[in-house]
């Protein structure tokens, strides 16, 4: 089927449903992605503070500046992909997964190296390497996210591949959270252990990206680049004229910052509040393992309640569990049970988000006459990078404010502060995210179905 739009020709295979193999392969893409991304989110702050010897507040500044830089460059990367000419038989997005993942793996190892120089020299290297890593990540993650919208317009298939993507993401988070620390403690010198272990996982990430590249197919094909010139104003126009995108961006800033600050602070909580850093592996085995329950039931929940209400339910579960966990005394068993419930809750809206992005891409095409998958996804990714910079900054500056001292016995104030960063901030942020998706997001599943029908009628 061919659909004539204002400035390009789109080839769409609308009838064919996605096979289980293709859905799983798409999920393997985020599985591979997590073997590089999660390493930075979980372990890089601790590497900076405890191995490289960078003060916590300065380490937080690295995350803030580097992620803000990546947030700014994301729309540029996305637009450059959308405006690329001479798209070959491999498709618009898939080649980036094949080549970009190899580059990203190398960059992942480099961010876990620290030259034997002054603190100023270490800061310069950390800033430079992490900012370059961010660009490399954008050239992989944006095409990967855009690929989902190019594979199908079927709402059920989109929910399905979003579910597989979330399973892949949780699978990688599960493995990196459980397996990395036991491997690191086997090295007498952490300056050697970190790059070796991270290099092992990054290589596995490349393999899983290759599976995604090989087995996924682009069916909604743009045969021409947009005729409108690539300018800052064209990118801004795409953003401000898409109200569902604006709302999703705002929601994501709160939801992802909550999710990431949890990942970063758990290692500190295990080491200092519970007194044994190796407990982190066992806790994560249960916590992240439990979160698969939310993802498994996601398609059925969406059928029953719709995407919007299902996301609100998930946020509500997580908020309640985190607040109760914060108020109770620190106990490894109680903490693990409540943290598991919270992760089940947050896994639900996190999984739905990817389907919402694809819906928003269709909305943008319906409203403007131009289909810009990569630009739209990069603008959404902009919010994720802002959230990541916020969580990294809050983690670092928060540790400084509460009086955290690396590799030492912490004060009572510091222990309470670590617990607040781990549980109280996420509860507040997720409550705000629940309000935003519930009252500000207006694109319903029924409206999206009508939009897809309108687009097909133009054929």
Swiss-Prot record:
Miscellaneous note, as given in the UniProt record, is: Member of the exu locus which is required for galacturonate utilization.
Question: Which keywords belong to this entry?
Answer: Cell membrane, Membrane, Symport, Transmembrane, Transmembrane helix, Transport
Q: How does it sit in the membrane?
A: Multi-pass membrane protein
Transmembrane residue ranges: 25-45, 52-72, 95-115, 123-143, 167-187, 192-212, 249-269, 279-299, 310-330, 332-352, 389-409, 420-440
Protein name according to UniProt: Uncharacterized symporter YjmB
Q: Which family does it belong to?
A: Belongs to the sodium:galactoside symporter (TC 2.A.2) family.
GO terms of biological process kind: carbohydrate transport; sodium ion transport; transmembrane transport
Q: Where in the cell is it found?
A: Cell membrane
* One Gene Ontology cellular component annotation held by this UniProt entry: plasma membrane
Short name of any one Pfam family annotated for the protein: MFS_2
């Amino acid at each position: 089927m061919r659909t004539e739009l204002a400035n390009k020709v789109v080839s769409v295979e609308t009838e064919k449903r996605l096979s289980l193999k293709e859905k799983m392969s798409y999920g393997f893409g985020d599985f591979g992605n997590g073997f590089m991304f999660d390493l930075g989110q979980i372990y890089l702050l601790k590497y900076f503070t405890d191995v490289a010897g960078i003060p916590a507040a300065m380490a937080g500044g690295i995350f803030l500046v580097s992620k803000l830089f990546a947030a700014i460059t994301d729309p540029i990367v996305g637009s450059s992909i959308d405006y690329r000419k001479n798209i070959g038989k491999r498709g618009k997005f898939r080649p980036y997964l094949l080549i970009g993942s190899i580059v990203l793996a190398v960059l992942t190892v480099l961010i876990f190296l620290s030259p034997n120089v002054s603190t100023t020299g270490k800061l310069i290297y950390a800033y430079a390497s992490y900012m370059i890593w961010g660009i490399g990540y954008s050239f992989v993650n944006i095409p990967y996210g855009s690929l989902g919208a190019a594979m199908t317009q079927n709402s059920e298939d989109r929910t399905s591949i979003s579910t597989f993507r979330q399973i892949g993401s949780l699978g990688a988070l599960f493995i990196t959270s459980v397996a990395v620390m036991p491997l690191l403690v086997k090295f007498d010198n952490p300056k050697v252990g970190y790059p070796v272990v991270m290099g092992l996982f990054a290589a596995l990430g490349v393999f899983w990206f290759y599976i995604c590249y090989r087995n996924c197919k682009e069916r909604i094909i743009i045969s021409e680049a947009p005729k409108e010139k690539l300018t800052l104003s064209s990118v801004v126009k795409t953003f401000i004229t898409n109200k569902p995108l604006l709302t999703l961006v705002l929601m994501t800033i709160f939801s992802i910052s909550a999710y990431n600050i949890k990942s970063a602070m758990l290692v500190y909580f295990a080491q200092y509040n519970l007194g044994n850093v190796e407990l982190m592996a066992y806790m994560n085995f249960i916590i992240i393992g439990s979160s698969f329950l939310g993802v498994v039931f996601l398609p059925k929940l969406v059928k029953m309640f719709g995407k919007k209400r299902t996301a609100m339910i998930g946020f509500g579960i997580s908020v309640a569990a985190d607040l109760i966990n914060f108020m109770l005394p620190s106990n490894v068993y109680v903490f693990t049970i409540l943290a598991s419930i919270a992760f089940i809750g947050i896994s639900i809206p996190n999984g739905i988000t990817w389907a919402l992005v694809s819906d928003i891409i269709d909305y943008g095409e319906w409203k403007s006459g131009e289909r810009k998958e990569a630009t739209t996804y990069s603008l959404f990714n902009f919010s994720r990078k802002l959230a990541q910079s916020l969580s990294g900054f809050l983690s670092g500056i928060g540790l400084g404010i509460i009086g955290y001292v690396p590799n030492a016995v912490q004060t009572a104030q510091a222990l309470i502060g670590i617990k607040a960063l781990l549980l109280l901030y996420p509860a507040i942020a997720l409550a705000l995210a629940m309000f935003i998706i519930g009252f500000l997001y207006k694109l319903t599943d029924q409206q999206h179905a009508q939009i897809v029908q309108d687009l097909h009628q133009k054929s």
